[in-house]
Amino acid sequence: MLTLEQLADLVGKHRAAAAARVAEFSIGAKKFNFNSHPAIMGVVNLSADSWYRESVCLSADSAVRRAKMLAAQGADIIDLGAESTLANAARVGDAAQTSRLLPVVRALRAAKIPVSVETYSPKVTRAALEAGASVLNLTGTAASRDVYKMVAAHDAAVIICFVQGRNVREVGDFDLSADAVPMMRDFFSRQIETAQRHGVKKILLDPGLGFYYRNLQDSAVRVRHQITVFLNSFRLRELGFPICHALPHAFEFFREEVRCAEPFFAVLAALGKTDLFRTHEVPRIRAVLETLQVIRHS
């Protein structure tokens, strides 16, 4: 059971981190004031393997309609993905990914909706940025130098995901032996240095809680890890950049109420000072964040 005493002890040990401020910048034409107003990233999946059925769109027209609906419901950015991160999902080649992504990216760009593309492929990255994507959601670091050069050339933002492996589809066991934050801080510090050296100015950091490590298949182990990282995320803000989190679903616990899972985890992520919430449930997360803002400013 999570207690007030545990939260007080956590903040007491890391008071400087709790007061840290992060970089604020524009994505597309939209200014993001992360230190005062957390933002929402709505998900549109272009892969039939994605299990969250409400977010799956198998045609460009349906994807554009869903993206515009999410923007109207409160999404600040739309995140597109053409390959599922599920461990048993089929691999999707670069050509197939770009054929699915580009019509949607172009349509949303024309509608002035900031677009993110989730990928670890340099070829998909190049095509997406040239088509008008404003954010690259980088789920692998094997080709990070090339990706950072492309991001900088387009004055785009990059979400650097923590991955223990070449990319999200090639992960093994997660190191659960100790506090994960120092390990993540070291990883992000190296990636930030590399990104900045190649000209990237707009950076967000994602601890990668939605990735399918082999030793996190047990539901209780996975949820305990996710909650611990959510609550400790504010410690990563000392690196100077906003924190992005993909909200989990915890189907084994929520079962037929699975659409309530992301709002539950959003509260914990907000307590850890998350700056960008990646979600399939935009209106529910918007309601949670607006309510927490009222409490914060009361």
Briefly describe each language-model feature range.
Residues 25, 70, 77, 119, ...:
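Active-site loop-to-helix "anion-binding N-cap" substructures in soluble metabolic enzymes
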Residues 65-77, 81, 107-108:
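A short, N-terminal amphipathic alpha-helix
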Residues 108-113, 197-200, 238-239:
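Short helix-capping segments at alpha-helix termini
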Residues 48-57, 73-84, 203, 209:
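Glycine/serine-rich anion-binding loops at beta->alpha junctions
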Residues 47, 120-121:
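A generic "binding-loop/recognition-motif" signal
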Residues 52-61, 65, 69, 85-103, ...:
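Active-site-adjacent loop and "lid" segments of alpha/beta metabolic enzymes
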Residues 1-48, 196, 290, 296-298:
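N-terminal amphipathic alpha-helix/helix-capping segment at the start of soluble metabolic enzymes
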Residues 39-43, 76-79, 114-116, 134-135, ...:
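Structural preference for beta-strand elements that scaffold enzyme active sites
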